[in-house]
């Protein structure tokens, strides 16, 4: 199977729907991944990279269906890790004399993985070119530590396609190949996760290397990555994002770290989060546990204990959250929250006007209509009668039917 990328460029890679761990177990690939290999058919036929070693046989068989292997004139290896060059041994067994173009560091890596120093290696450096006929050339650009010492990119003149290696990719498997064909929200979330996990340690190298590449003043109509989608619609948008992420990027976001045995500390953390959101609604508050589980961390079983914060303690937590939001704001706060007195003024609508507070009969958690439950999108000022039927007690996760009117407020 192959997919036309542009003109005489075909994708001949492999989709991996089932992979869930990458680089050990530290990077969870919940949407799988792909290993992108490209076949360029001009006067000279060029293969850009292979696929992961576990797909070696399928890859070579698929390639054989596209072209007589003996007609492959050059192999370009942008990166020597097994998810890029893993099928080399299987392929070179069929065409052992085919020239391989790569960096000097890549030769060491390839020999370390495949143990064939007799292969026909050709070292390339930044600015070196390879004529492939029909007026087209490959231009090589070394990109050490983005993200490996042997890394490089390859640019195809005429078609203006940049084969970018690991840069600008995502571990994102989809039946579609191009960026304009997939869900944009999910795509950019996966791009950011990929940058955070693969390239963040090398951020200080990203900006100068991208600047160097842009300095060649080469048009870029497409960016063909080693993993994930090919960027054909506004391809430089991902380049602009990389420059942004590399420049000490931070969002107006606060993460609350907490651990809890019986959900009491969680109640306090939620109250702090409520205070933050009251003061600066633009700030996103993430619960770390879900992110850690997404990253592959295991959570231990909890141990129940007695201590629970009362309403006064929770209000102290909310005020603490408000103060955090005021001190850490990256931009001027919305006018409606500048004066924290507004919080008290808006509570001119008294609890009595909103109806009684409700108490969970199982865990004793109290729903206060004046405060709502922002973590379930129940806004402050929502009477119990208007709370959605799918509401769950934040502490014991039981439904509305276990709630009774607070005894002290019962008529």
Swiss-Prot record:
| Positions contributing to Fe cation 3 binding | 360, 363, 393, 396
Record-level Gene Ontology MF annotations: electron transfer activity; iron ion binding; nitric oxide reductase activity
The Gene Ontology CC terms held by the record are:
cytoplasm
Q: Which residues bind Fe cation 1?
A: 79, 81, 147, 166
In terms of InterPro entries, this protein maps to: Anaer_NO_rdtase_flvorubredoxin, Flavoprotein-like_sf, Metallo-B-lactamas, ODP_dom, RibonucZ/Hydroxyglut_hydro, Rubredoxin-like_dom, Rubredoxin_dom
Which intervals of the chain are annotated as region Zinc metallo-hydrolase?
30-210
| Functional note | Anaerobic nitric oxide reductase; uses NADH to detoxify nitric oxide (NO), protecting several 4Fe-4S NO-sensitive enzymes. Has at least 2 reductase partners, only one of which (NorW, flavorubredoxin reductase) has been identified. NO probably binds to the di-iron center. Also able to function as an aerobic oxygen reductase.
Family as reported in the entry's similarity comment: In the N-terminal section; belongs to the zinc metallo-hydrolase group 3 family.
The name this protein goes by in its record: Anaerobic nitric oxide reductase flavorubredoxin homolog
Write the gene name.
norV
